[in-house]
Amino acid sequence: MTEIKTILSQLVEASHAGTLKRYDKIGETKPYYGVPMGALSKIAKTYINQSDLFVPLWQTGILEAQYLAIQIVKNKPDQLVASDLKSSISKQVSHNILDKLASLILSKRRDSKDWEEYLLTQDQAIFQRLGWFLRAKYFARKTATDQEIEQTLTYIEEHLKTTDPLIQWIMK
């Protein structure tokens, strides 16, 4: 726990007025310290691949601590236990954080297809958006079968206009 306190102190010290102002302007999910991404990356290098820090950092609920948790484990996303990941996906978490989690962690895991299916079955639009993001990544890897592509295109054609705007952009 001392290590988490040290990390949080580093985040407080790295706070920047311009970043705080930007977060306020865009209505970012609080709490946050206003740490620029470059400073976060620099702090993350000290703790790289220490996956045991992911959960305690995430549980602080602090925006930059969650970004940092992602940065620390992004090179070895399969080290994270699925149950820890599942408990970190919450509608209270910043959409930007969840997007980063999907991009840098979920999409690079061996079980990313399972995450796609799980997220697409959730009621919350933000989770479905993450599921569609993972589906797009799957298609981009060119491993989808012709049948999967056809089924997805048919689904998009039938549902695009009535789908939550949060999901529409990814579907397009």
Where are the language model's segments positioned?
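Alpha-helical scaffold domains
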Residues: 1-172
